[in-house]
Structures are given as structure tokens and as C-alpha cells.
């Protein structure tokens, strides 16, 4: 990037209802997703020769909440470097000064699909356990830095056709050391842990509940706790898992406890009935063993009382998962979060704006000095060409046939379905 920005470095293109003003190195923009946090386009990076995802943060300075989320996401993405966490490749703004500053663009790896597009596939145990292993590795890496994701759901987990998986979207991630009372509307309702629903606060294994919900959804092909609202979500949980013990009730605030204790009592359904043998792969005796292990893992993750729920470390060592265990992945050095006050910070919008601007300028300065001129090892295959289109919106070619890819063979056919090969 040149020492001073010029209009010639950027060009504008209309994407849905938004205008993307991006560096000219990013061509062939195509919208692939949108949400409260921003709009995402697939693009081809003519400098690195790879397909990337360009995310434009939606009105990051419209209020303090949006501004804080934007700052948090940017800081965390800059700090985290793990093969199961999405990699940040570039950050830029087309504006030249703090006074003009209003747009933030994040450039990240482009994957083939998110888990929403995988839910209805018939996954064998090998692929399912490997996807879960990677999910847990990514979560453990975040937890090792005191970061709780808080918003794990199928749309925030992306995969490639070689069965690699990455976690994305850190707008809601929060450091664990912060003293706070949780708002119940942190996580998408279906994946929200009981302690969040009941306003108990949380610890790291709040993310394990979400993983359990996602695993259950992968097994059954549908959302397992599909509440219509906040209260109904709790009802759906206890209808299946049973009314919690008196010991758990004592941990609740009096008003919440009064409500919970006055709900109809449910004995709960056995996990053998919630997740019967026939919904798992059962082609061999080995599959039957794996089915028993998978169900056992679900029963340990989907526990209402967080004090009795399995931890990330325990999940990684569970028989269903541990076959994949690699210390380099599961015990990677924790990321160093350079802003120790990441959560305690409270600022006016203009102050948040200045902090974010400094982060963007810091990235651009480091890029000029060659610190960030290449993607990390986790980036997508550099063999992509402009003519290769990501299959992120076309998963019709997904294969459920068991084909193993070499650990070292990262080359991908762009027409291949997201889970065509698993290591």
C-alpha cells in the first residue's frame, strides 16, 4: 500500500443495497452473505492470487454497541492465529482521515460452505468426529486466551471440501475475566445455554452447550431445541432433558427460580430415545461402537447444569474425538490479546471510532513494512484462479462417499462439494 491513499487505489461497486468501495486488488465481487454485523462478498485477490471474503461492517459507528463489537472483532481477529479460526488477511478503509472515516473492510479466507449447508448431509462418524474435533480445537484456542465466543451456531462455522473447519464472527466474543451479568440475547436462541437463558452468567463451557446443539443438529438433520421465544426455548430444553435438580435451582435468582419451579415437571427423555441408533451410520460393528460414543458425548455436552457439563479439554479427550488429537492443534500457544481492557472499555462513539481507526492504520502501516504481505498457513489454497468460483452457494455436488485426502494434499477442485474429502 502506498504512503498516502489516492482515489486511484479504490473502486466502487454496488452490492445489493450497499456500495462497496474496495482496493482494486479485489476483483469480481459477489455477495455471499449478510447479517447484523455486515455484508460479505466473495472476491479474487489479484495480488495473492487467491479467492477471499471481503466483509464490510454495517454502520459500525451508528451506536456504542455496534462500535464496541466492531472494535472487539477487529482486535481479536488481529490477535488470533490458529488453523481452526478464520484468518484475517487484510483490513482497510477507503477514507483518508479520521474525520472522514466511516467504513471498515475486513478481508478473510474464503471457505466453501457453512455448516447450515452441511446439516442435511448424511455424515459418517469419521467426518462428524473430525468436524467436532476441529470445532473444539478452535474453541480451546480462544478459551486459552480467556475468550468465550458466545455465538457459536452453524452459520458461524465454515468448512472446505477437504473437511477442514474454521470458526468465524467474533463480534460477540467476550473475555472470561469480565465481571458481568449476561443479557439473555447474546446467542442465537436455538444454541443458547440454559445458564444464559436463566441469566446466571457463564463460564467457558457455555460454548460446549452450543457445540452439543450443533452436533445434535448434524446427527438429526434439524434443530434440536427450537423454541419460538425466550421462555419457550427453556421449555423445549426441559421437555427433552428433564426438569433440573433442586441443587441447580438453588443457583438461580429468586424470581427466576420461582418461575422455573412453577413450570410443569418433566422426567426427561433418555438419550437412546433422543438420538436412536437408526439416525446414526450403522454399516459395521465399528459404526455401532462409534454411535455409542457419539451419543455419550452428546449426553455430556447437553447438560443443563454448567457445573456438571463436560469441559473443552474433556471433550477433546473423549473416545469419540480423541482419535484425531494432535497437540500442535489442540494445545497451540494461546493468542496474546494486546488490549487488556478489551471488555472493560466504555467509550463515546467518537472515541470508539478513533480506536478503530488506529487499528486500521496500524494494520496498513504493518502491511507497508511487509509484516502482513502473505496469508497464514491456514489460508485457502493459493492455486485458485480468477475463473474458479467458490462453491459456497452451490453444494449440490457434495458427496457423502468416504474418500480420504492426504494430510499434505491441500489442492482442491473448485467444483468439489464442501466435504468431498476428509483427511
From Swiss-Prot:
Protein's UniProt name: Mitogen-activated protein kinase 9
Active site: 151
Pfam family, one: Pkinase
Location of Phosphotyrosine modifications: 185
Species annotation: Rattus norvegicus (Rat)
PANTHER family documented for this protein: MITOGEN-ACTIVATED PROTEIN KINASE
Record-level GO cellular component terms: cytoplasm; cytosol; mitochondrion; nucleus; perikaryon; Schaffer collateral - CA1 synapse
UniProt binding sites for ATP: 32-40, 55
Gene responsible for this protein: Mapk9
PTM summary: Dually phosphorylated on Thr-183 and Tyr-185 by MAP2K7 and MAP2K4, which activates the enzyme. Autophosphorylated in vitro.
Tagged with keyword Phosphoprotein: yes
Chain positions found as Phosphothreonine: 183
Protein localization: Cytoplasm; Nucleus
Amino acid at each position: 500500500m502506498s504512503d498516502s491513499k489516492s482515489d486511484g487505489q479504490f473502486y466502487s461497486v454496488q452490492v445489493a443495497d450497499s456500495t462497496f468501495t474496495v482496493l482494486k486488488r479485489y476483483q469480481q465481487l459477489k455477495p455471499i452473505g449478510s447479517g447484523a454485523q455486515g455484508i460479505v462478498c466473495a472476491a479474487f485477490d489479484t495480488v495473492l492470487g487467491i479467492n477471499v471474503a471481503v466483509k464490510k461492517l454495517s454502520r459500525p459507528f451508528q451506536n456504542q454497541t455496534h462500535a464496541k463489537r466492531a472494535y472487539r472483532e477487529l482486535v481479536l481477529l488481529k490477535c488470533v492465529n490458529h488453523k481452526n479460526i478464520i484468518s484475517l488477511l487484510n483490513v482497510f478503509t477507503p477514507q483518508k482521515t479520521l474525520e472522514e472515516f466511516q467504513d471498515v473492510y475486513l478481508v478473510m479466507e474464503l471457505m466453501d460452505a457453512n455448516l447450515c449447508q452441511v446439516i442435511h448431509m448424511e455424515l459418517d462418524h469419521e467426518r462428524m468426529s473430525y468436524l467436532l474435533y476441529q470445532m473444539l480445537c478452535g474453541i480451546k484456542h480462544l478459551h486459552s486466551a480467556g475468550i468465550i465466543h458466545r455465538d457459536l451456531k452453524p452459520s458461524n462455522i465454515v468448512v472446505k471440501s477437504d473437511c477442514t473447519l474454521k470458526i468465524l464472527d467474533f463480534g460477540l466474543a467476550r473475555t472470561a475475566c469480565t465481571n458481568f451479568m449476561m443479557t439473555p440475547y447474546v446467542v442465537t436462541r436455538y444454541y443458547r445455554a440454559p445458564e444464559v437463558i436463566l441469566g446466571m452468567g457463564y463460564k467457558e463451557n457455555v460454548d460446549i452447550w452450543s457445540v452439543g446443539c450443533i452436533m445434535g443438529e448434524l446427527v438429526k438433520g434439524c434443530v434440536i431445541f427450537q423454541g419460538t421465544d425466550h421462555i419457550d426455548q427453556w421449555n423445549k430444553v426441559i421437555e427433552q432433558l428433564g426438569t433440573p435438580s433442586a441443587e441447580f435451582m438453588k443457583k438461580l435468582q429468586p424470581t427466576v427460580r420461582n418461575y422455573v419451579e412453577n413450570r410443569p415437571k418433566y422426567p426427561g427423555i433418555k438419550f437412546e430415545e433422543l438420538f436412536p441408533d437408526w439416525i446414526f451410520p450403522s454399516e459395521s460393528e465399528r459404526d455401532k461402537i462409534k454411535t455409542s460414543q457419539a451419543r455419550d458425548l452428546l449426553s455430556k455436552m447437553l447438560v443443563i447444569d454448567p457445573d456438571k457439563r463436560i469441559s473443552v479439554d474433556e471433550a477433546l479427550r473423549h473416545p469419540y474425538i480423541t482419535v484425531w488429537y494432535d497437540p500442535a492443534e489442540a494445545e497451540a500457544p494461546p493468542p496474546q490479546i494486546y488490549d487488556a481492557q478489551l471488555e472493560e472499555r466504555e467509550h463515546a462513539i467518537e472515541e470508539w471510532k478513533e480506536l478503530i481507526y488506529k487499528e486500521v492504520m496500524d494494520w496498513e502501516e504493518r502491511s507497508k513494512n511487509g509484516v502482513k504481505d502473505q496469508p497464514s498457513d491456514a489460508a485457502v489454497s493459493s492455486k485458485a484462479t480468477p475463473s474458479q468460483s467458490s462453491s459456497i452457494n452451490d453444494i449440490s455436488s457434495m458427496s457423502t462417499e468416504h474418500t480420504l485426502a492426504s494430510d499434505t494434499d491441500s489442492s482442491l477442485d473448485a467444483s468439489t462439494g464442501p466435504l468431498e474429502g476428509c483427511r
